[in-house]
């Protein structure tokens, strides 16, 4: 594949073939699992190279046809010529169409019902048409009924689901529908600027189009007004419907590495047929590539016509990836009611569903999604591995994760991170332990992990010099009555003592108080384990003996006390080691297993203790800081960091602190739990500002803020914004959002906000009723018809009171400010708008049916006085 690739597309009726185009056009076949041929291979997808088409270079647009006998494409060129290619050596001149006037071909669309009919769109020419309907079996079109749009340009084109109506975006200002069933095709048009990317959903209920950063949804059966507009932060590059889902719309945005998905839902509330959507952004790149710079942007996407939620992606105009959407559970909240969106299902049953009947040792985890008819469908990934739903935790189906996240937000989860506060929240023990660990490690406005504290792999940096200190080692003496020839070497340094404290262990002189605290918290086995690690074996026996009196089943503690009190390592170490592996399976308490592993160790081999995952990472790290040499300690820290990244264990932040490894741990936890709330709040509370340049942190925070907005939790959102702003540099950036005049485009905000001196009523009214630059009238309030910026009570002779040295905008109550709907753009004074929507549901403008207040989750009848 030479040069950059501009686009790619699956063939609708050839599920294993796709075409890519750029300088040349190439045909590929996805390699089967048992195919080991080496004809050609792309870097990130196993394919066989089949053919290329060199006659048509630098294609402007390419469309794969619906022919079922052979792969055929239509190619549109910059000079307007359109060619039909079947990747054979034979040349047929009848398969080329050249318009009368030379200009660029802009769009192509095959008819799904009649595979020989092609719709062609060209750029504008004043004496020629821009839309051509070509039946390739009948040769070059000549009848006037096949040409439309004289003196116009075609921006995009598609077919309706009845396959007899052509829908075209024309001249950047309208959408036209041409019904070809009529002898002289009738035309229906609607004025709009969203004319790019026209496409009809698989169920035929929605028509989508876009311009810049706005996506518009239409009803193709009644296209008088849009159903909904979706605003994005970036301009769109491509939009497309997923063919295996009823209403899943995908969008690629310029200079973005994410795929944005909109799950469109219609809820018939009071016969209004309101449209809602659930937005989701996913990164198609493997986690190990997300921060490596290997991939930057997604340039093109092509959905597979049969495989469930499978797509081809073009990254950086060079790399082609075969991608399938990860399994997710959707539960959304509308502003009026809760909308449950369960496990997504395909539109139809695959032709050959896979079945698994392997032995227990060979069986791979599979799952199925039940359809309404009771049958089951198994979905497989392109590589052959099963579409695994069983990997989702069962709690996800039993608990409403959205409700849980929303409830935590209402309880100020993560706003004030302190241990007492987290004890009052409804958190899992895992999250409560994670936050407690982070609070313990966080000091001096930094989350310094044990890796930095111990000076591991820091080179010759200043942190390494601060962490370097003299390490003392001493041989510990076993207690009297316990004969053990193994030398137990303990390592001490200032950094290791600090690490022990960060792990929650007390200093030697405060050990008894620490053990008593654990005993008071009924952590008996952990207290006994720490005593044994400090060679206070008889103290551990006393703890377990006292604890056994308070237990319903004291047998395990009693047996442990007997074993410890009569332990003699030199006499029975071999016997204990032989029995330990089988006995550990019977001991359910991990702390007791660690006790026996420690006592029966061979020389300085502590692997059994360090690999006991039932013991918390902080306890294992404290043990490692006490008994491991420098080299072994560094290796163990590196192993645990990698294990935390692979498993998504937030406890690994104890080791990494605020670093790139810490961000990788958060990303891995996010991938496995979908808990964007915890990930965002950890980053906000404990990561320094320099790390906020990482796109992943920005994405987590933006996603969580979007959740708060969708729930109408404006005050919680504001509190979080204030907290985020407090950790940023104190230098305040200049204002970047202005009110601009519709006529001259200049800022009106300065005139509206900066009024340091009181003015007379007449002067102020005249000045505020028009643009200060072009003097054109400003918008009026929909209810009182006063101009924007005019105080509500000015017409009654009241003047706003101002105080010296106070800007004018601070003396205006919020209820007198101007607000407007983001959908219909109608507005007015906030006080008037609030009063109107307490009694009405539609926009106050008589010709507008927009339900403006439904965009907010707050009920009008419960609003408090905002003046």
UniProtKB/Swiss-Prot annotation:
GO terms for biological process: cell division; cellular response to amino acid starvation; double-strand break repair; germarium-derived egg chamber formation; meiotic cell cycle; negative regulation of autophagy; oocyte differentiation; oocyte fate determination. A zinc finger (RING-type) spans 778-857. Pfam families: MIOS_a-sol (PF21719), MIOS_WD40 (PF21720), zinc_ribbon_16 (PF17034). It is found in: Nucleus; Lysosome. Zn(2+) 2 binds at residues 784, 829, 832. Zn(2+) 3 binds at residues 821, 824, 852. A zinc finger (C4-type) spans 739-777. GO terms for molecular function: zinc ion binding. Zn(2+) 4 binds at residues 824, 826, 843, 848. InterPro entries: MIOS/Sea4 (IPR037593), MIOS_a-sol (IPR049092), WD40/YVTN_repeat-like_dom_sf (IPR015943), WD40_repeat_dom_sf (IPR036322), WD40_rpt (IPR001680), Zn_ribbon_mio (IPR031488). WD repeats lie at residues 51-86, 100-144, 149-188, 190-228, 231-272. Residues 350-376 have a biased composition (Low complexity). Present in the oocyte. GO terms for cellular component: autolysosome; cytoplasm; female germ cell nucleus; GATOR2 complex; lysosome; nucleus; protein-containing complex; Seh1-associated complex. Residues 350-378 are annotated as: Disordered. An essential component of the GATOR subcomplex GATOR2 which functions as an activator of the amino acid-sensing branch of the mTORC1 signaling pathway. The two GATOR subcomplexes, GATOR1 and GATOR2, regulate the mTORC1 pathway in order to mediate metabolic homeostasis, female gametogenesis and the response to amino acid limitation and complete starvation. GATOR2 activates the mTORC1 signaling pathway through the inhibition of the GATOR1 subcomplex, controlling the switch to cell proliferation and growth under nutrient replete conditions and during female oocyte development. Component of the GATOR complex consisting of mio, Nup44A/Seh1, Im11, Nplr3, Nplr2, Wdr24, Wdr59 and Sec13. Within the GATOR complex, probable component of the GATOR2 subcomplex which is likely composed of mio, Nup44A/Seh1, Wdr24, Wdr59 and Sec13. Interacts with Wdr24. Interacts with nucleoporin Nup44A/Seh1. The GATOR2 complex associates with unmet in the absence of S-adenosyl-L-methionine; the mio-Wdr24-Nup44A subcomplex is essential and sufficient for this interaction while Wdr59 and Sec13 are dispensable. Belongs to the WD repeat mio family. This protein rapidly evolved the ability to recruit the methyltransferase unmet at an evolutionary branch point between honeybees and mosquitos, corresponding to the emergence of the order Diptera. This allowed the GATOR2 complex to repurpose the substrate binding ability of unmet to function as a nutrient sensor for methionine. The WD repeats are important for recruitment of the methionine nutrient sensor unmet. This is GATOR2 complex protein Mio. It comes from Drosophila melanogaster (Fruit fly).
């Amino acid at each position: 594949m030479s040069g950059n690739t501009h686009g790619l597309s699956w063939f609708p009726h050839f599920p294993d073939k796709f075409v890519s185009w750029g300088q040349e056009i190439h045909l590929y076949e996805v390699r089967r699992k048992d195919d080991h041929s080496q004809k050609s291979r792309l870097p990130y997808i196993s394919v066989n190279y089949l053919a290329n088409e060199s006659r048509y270079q630098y294609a402007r647009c390419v469309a794969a046809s619906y022919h079922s006998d052979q792969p055929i494409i239509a190619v549109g060129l910059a000079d307007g010529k359109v060619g039909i290619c079947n990747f054979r050596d034979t040349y047929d001149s009848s398969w080329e169409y050249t318009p009368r006037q030379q200009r660029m071909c802009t769009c192509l669309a095959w008819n799904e019902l009649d595979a020989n009919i092609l719709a062609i769109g060209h750029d504008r020419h004043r004496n020629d048409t821009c839309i051509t309907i070509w039946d390739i079996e009948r040769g070059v079109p000549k009848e006037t009924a096949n040409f439309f749009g004289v003196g116009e340009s075609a921006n995009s084109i598609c077919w309706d689901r009845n396959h007899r109506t052509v829908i075209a975006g024309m001249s950047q200002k309208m959408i036209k529908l041409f019904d070809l069933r009529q002898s002289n095709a009738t035309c229906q048009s609607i004025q709009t600027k969203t004319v790019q990317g026209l496409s009809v959903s698989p169920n035929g209920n929605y028509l989508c189009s876009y311009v810049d950063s706005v996506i518009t949804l239409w009803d193709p059966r009644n296209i008088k007004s849009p159903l909904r507009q979706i605003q994005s932060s970036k301009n769109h590059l491509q939009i497309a419907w997923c063919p295996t889902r009823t209403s899943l719309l995908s969008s690629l945005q310029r200079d973005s590495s994410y795929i944005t998905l909109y799950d469109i839902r219609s809820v018939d509330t009071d016969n209004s047929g309101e449209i809602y959507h659930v937005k989701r952004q996913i990164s198609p790149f493997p986690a190990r590539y997300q921060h490596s710079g290997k991939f930057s942007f997604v340039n093109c996407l092509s959905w597979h016509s049969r495989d469930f939620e499978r797509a081809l992606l073009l990254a950086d105009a060079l790399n082609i990836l075969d991608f399938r959407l990860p399994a997710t559970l959707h539960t959304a909240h509308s502003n009026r009611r809760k909308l449950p969106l369960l496990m997504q299902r395909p539109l139809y049953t695959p032709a050959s569903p896979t079945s698994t009947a392997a032995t227990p040792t060979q069986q791979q985890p599979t799952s199925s999604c039940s359809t309404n008819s009771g049958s089951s469908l198994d979905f497989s990934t392109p590589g052959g591995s099963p579409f695994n739903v069983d990997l989702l935790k069962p709690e996800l189906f039993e608990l409403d994760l959205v409700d849980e996240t929303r409830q935590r937000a209402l309880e100020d989860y993560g706003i004030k991170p302190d241990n007492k506060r987290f004890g009052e929240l409804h958190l899992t023990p895992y999250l409560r332990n994670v936050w407690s660990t982070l609070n313990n490690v966080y000091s001096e406005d930094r989350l310094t992990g044990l890796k930095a504290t111990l000076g591991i792999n820091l080179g010759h940096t200043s942190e390494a010099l601060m962490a370097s200190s003299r390490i003392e080692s001493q041989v510990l003496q076993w207690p009297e009555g316990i004969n053990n020839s193994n030398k137990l070497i303990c390592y001490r340094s200032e950094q290791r003592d600090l690490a022990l404290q960060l792990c929650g262990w007390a200093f030697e002189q405060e050990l008894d108080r620490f053990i008593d605290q654990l005993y008071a918290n009924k952590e008996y086995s952990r207290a006994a384990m720490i005593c044994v690690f400090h060679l206070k074996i008889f103290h551990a026996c006393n703890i377990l003996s006292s604890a056994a009196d308070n237990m319903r089943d004291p047998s395990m503690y009693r047996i442990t006390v007997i074993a410890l009190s009569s332990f003699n390592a030199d006499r029975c170490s071999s016997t204990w080691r032989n029995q330990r592996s089988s006995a550990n399976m019977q001991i359910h308490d991990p702390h007791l297993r660690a006790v026996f592993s420690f006592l029966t160790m061979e020389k300085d081999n502590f692997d059994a203790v360090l690999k006991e995952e039932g013991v918390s990472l902080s306890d294992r790290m404290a043990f490692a800081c006490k008994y491991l040499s420098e080299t072994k300690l560094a290796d163990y820290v590196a192993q645990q960091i990698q294990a935390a990244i692979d498993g998504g264990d937030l406890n690994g932040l104890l080791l990494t602190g605020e670093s790139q490894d810490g961000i990788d741990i958060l990303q891995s936890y996010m991938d496995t739990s979908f808990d964007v709330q915890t990930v965002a709040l950890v980053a906000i509370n404990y990561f320094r500002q320099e790390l906020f340049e990482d796109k992943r942190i920005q994405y987590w925070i933006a996603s969580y803020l979007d959740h708060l907005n969708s729930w109408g939790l404006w005050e919680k959102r504001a509190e979080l914004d204030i907290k985020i702003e407090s950790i940023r540099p104190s230098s305040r950036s200049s204002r970047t959002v202005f009110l601009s005049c519709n006529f001259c485009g200049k800022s009106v905000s300065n005139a509206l906000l900066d009024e340091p001196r009181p003015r007379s009523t007449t002067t102020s009214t005249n000045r505020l009723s028009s643009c200060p630059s072009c003097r054109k009238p400003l918008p009026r309030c929909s209810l009182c018809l006063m101009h924007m910026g005019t105080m509500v009570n000015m017409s009654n002779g009241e003047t706003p009171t101002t105080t010296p040295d106070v800007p004018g905008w601070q003396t205006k109550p919020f209820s007198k400010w101007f607000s407007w709907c983001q959908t219909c753009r109608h507005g007015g004074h906030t006080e008037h708008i609030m009063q109107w929507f307490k009694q009405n549901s539609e926009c106050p403008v008589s010709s507008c049916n927009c339900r403006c207040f439904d965009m907010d989750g707050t009920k009008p009848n419960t609003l408090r006085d905002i003046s």
